[in-house]
């Protein structure tokens, strides 16, 4: 995907393919289905829209860009993010935002629309984490040890 000259890429019927958008820059990627682990890892400025759910480790070590998931995300969402933005309409799993860090003008941002699991923001060294709890019936929309 990084080698293609196409700037706009659309994937239909995605069923767990991993590493989509890894290291990409200046691409517009639209995914229908459920991408696998490490979606947008090491990304450097692309935009990814997922119309479905996403598996674990989306945005792993991401430098820049935006990932929008119009469903739920798995565990370790935004692991070691250094920049960029991740928006998840629904829930995210355990260890969301773990080991996030900001450096100079890079400030990672994760916004979760509903709930997150335990260990949210563990070892965070910068960046912004927001959990809205829009559909949550719990007293607090975050898990334990946050």
Regions found by a protein language model. Name each.
Residues 1-146:
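Long, distal/terminal scaffolding or interaction modules
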